């Protein structure tokens, strides 16, 4: 990552930190910076059914993830495997819908390739590109290995 959390907090009024792709069981941490927190956020969240009843579970996960840089180490693994996936897709001649340095890669697939790849890998429909192509999302996580990328390369 080329920005620190304190720098991000200076640049934003609010941001969130995802947990599941870094190994958390569930949850995201919403961070309000400075004086930008809304009035009474917890009751508002509860009223809309978006608060885990046992919120301590989510908090403990983030406490562990931010100990000794674990969150960033895990995130780096996801991004490195996503970039390896990107290279494989590029080598196979696939076009990218978006340029992204993250753990998510958005690829324009011929519809028949999408059907075939889905038999071997988990990909997410993103949007219809044209009559014969679809944009899909490939997403890596803390658990994605080079062996996973190699297995997908064999399918491609």
Predicted regions and their residues:
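Conserved C-terminal alpha-helix-loop-beta "cap" of PLP-dependent enzymes
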Residues: 83, 88-156
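N-terminal hydrophobic targeting segments
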Residues: 2-3, 108
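Active-site C-terminal subdomain of aminotransferase-like
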Residues: 3-92, 97-102
């Amino acid at each position: 990552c080329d920005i620190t959390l304190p720098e991000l907090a200076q640049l934003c009024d609010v941001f969130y930190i995802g947990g599941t792709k870094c190994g958390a069981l569930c949850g995201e941490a919403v961070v309000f910076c400075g004086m930008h927190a809304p009035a009474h956020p917890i009751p508002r969240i509860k009223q809309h059914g978006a608060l885990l009843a046992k919120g301590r579970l989510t908090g403990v996960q983030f406490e562990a993830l931010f100990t000794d840089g674990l969150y960033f180490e895990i995130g780096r693994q996801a991004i490195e495997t996503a970039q390896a996936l990107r290279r494989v897709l590029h080598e196979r001649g696939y076009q990218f819908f978006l340029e992204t340095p993250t753990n998510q890669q958005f690829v324009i697939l011929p519809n028949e390739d999408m059907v075939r790849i889905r038999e071997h890998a988990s990909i997410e429909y993103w949007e219809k590109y044209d009559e014969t192509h679809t944009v899909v999302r490939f997403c890596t996580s803390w658990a994605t290995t080079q062996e996973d990328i190699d297995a997908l390369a064999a399918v491609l």
